[in-house]
Every structure is written in structure tokens, then in C-alpha cells.
């Protein structure tokens, strides 16, 4: 009798009755290759694959929500709307304002071409990057970056004048070509500052470099052409900073005003209303925080997508999940957010394929 009681207790513990999840959660099911190779369906199946594949599927959903949102989706509040904002045609034309941030290593990689595609077709509204994210774009117009290996010895590469970025190799000659190209531009900027009272800011400098490079492979060129602002808070950290340093010895006096740029950057968020704002941030560091901080000025972004491999246990901003930014007012509590823990060189091209690129293809097909 006692044994039966114990067995019954153990049985009820092991086989505890479950709450039904039917209709509440997606069933986990991967792509069936018996259907043939269909890449759009494969990408859509990520949502129900599990782990970071599901997070990638969620990222795709959130970005598509950014792209599909229109002011006409919102209820009109007459007391808060201008006459223009009450017009149905105007409301249908107002889209989400998208901030794109990325670190320099992604421009060193082939993700540069994905970024260039977005900028070329004016699919994003504001860009924030690091100095490396600027100079690597320009340098690639002058000379290529090559595939190497993560394990190549640093001392050996140094003896050959080769710089390693992960498993990429950048010959030091590339930076020599960069110096030859950019110093005359600094000279001309200084002349315009003195003779025409031009007030240079980091974003004005980057627009000028985009104009001067005049190369369609460059995202900076397309940002200049499309009048998309590119902000770089840490302008002097990198080869571009080295060039400014060397130039200051040749002829002093070139001034670049960062205060005007913080007003401009924060203004992009503050004056976005009545638009919603969305953040797509690849990697962490300065671009991630600069975009989030600007959106704090408007009580937070409405959509946020983070793609990086950073962890939050060390308290770094780079590794923080979107929910931490909610606590600061940088992302709204009601926002659609997701972070995918993945190398952005893998995740971002797949994301663009199933969002920006597919929607552009559909739009082109509809027009024809």
C-alpha cells in the first residue's frame, strides 16, 4: 500500500498536467527541403525553427512592421493634429523614420555592399557609424581588402605591411593611398573655412567626402546623393583621425564642430513626429548608444532591432538587451523590439533579403 502511494506521488510529479499551448504559441517546425529550395520560404521558416533562428525570424517581422507602418494606421486625435496631419493622402505618405547604425568591421566586410544598397535606394533615413565605418568605405574605392585567416601571426603580418581585421587583410599601402587622396580635401576645406566662413561639422565633412569620392560602390557617395545624414561621434578615432593629426602639422586651423552635430543628430529624432522611429543597429559601441540616446529625446523609439554577439553580464552598453534601453526611455515600453545574438555578416544580408529587398522587388513588379 505504501509503495503504491509513493509510486502514485512520483508518477504525478513526473507526469504533471500541462497547460495547453495550442493557439497561444507557434509550433516548432523547420523547413522541409522536400518542398524544393525556396529561399523566401526558408527564411520565413526561421521564425519556427527555434533558438537564434527564431530571433532572426522575429527581427524580420519587426523590420517589416517598420516598413509597412503609415501614419494612416493611427487613430486621428484632432486636438493633437495639424490640418495637414488630418489629410488622408498625407497620412498615407508618412512612413517610419529608420536609423541605421553599424560598426567599422562591417564596412570592412562584404556587408558594406548591403549597406550601400539600402542607402542607394533611400531605404534608411539616418546613419550612425564609427570612424572606421567611414574610412573603410572610402579606402575600398581606392584599393581592395582581401580574405585572409583568423590565425595568421601578427608579427609576420606586420613584417609584410599587412593589417588584419579578423580574417580580412588590408595592405598598409591602402592607407598611404587614402592619405594622398584626403589631405588635399582637408586643404580645400580649410581654405573654405577661412575665405567663406564655412562651419564644418563631422556630418558635413562626411557629406563632402561622399561627394569627392564620386564612386557608386561607396555608401557615403549615395548618402551624399540622397541627402541622408551620416553621423560619426568619434571622428578622430581611426585612420581619418590620423590624417587630421598629420594635417594639423602641415597647416593648423581646420575646425570641426561636434556640438552642431549633436544638435543635428538629436534633432533627427526630436523632429521626427508625427512619424514613428525605428532603430536597426549592427554591433554595439558608439553607434548603438548614439542612436538610442537621440531617441531618448523623443521618449523612445517605436521599433528596435539589435544584431550583435554582445552579452549583458558585464554591464556593457554593447551587450545590453533592448529592455535595458526601455528603462532609460530610449525605447518606448510599447515598442516592438528584438535582439538576435548572431554575427551580423550572417544575419544582416538575410534580414535585408526578406525585408527591404523583397519589398522593393514587389514594388518594381507592381509598377511594371
Curated annotation (Swiss-Prot):
Stored InterPro entries: Deoxyhypusine_synthase (IPR002773), Deoxyhypusine_synthase_sf (IPR036982), DHS-like_NAD/FAD-binding_dom (IPR029035)
Q: Which residues bind spermidine?
A: 135-136, 242, 289, 315-317, 324-330
**UniProt EC number:** 2.5.1.46
Q: Which Pfam families match?
A: DS
The answer to whether keyword Membrane applies is: no
Q: What cofactor is needed? A: NAD(+)
Listed name of the protein: Deoxyhypusine synthase
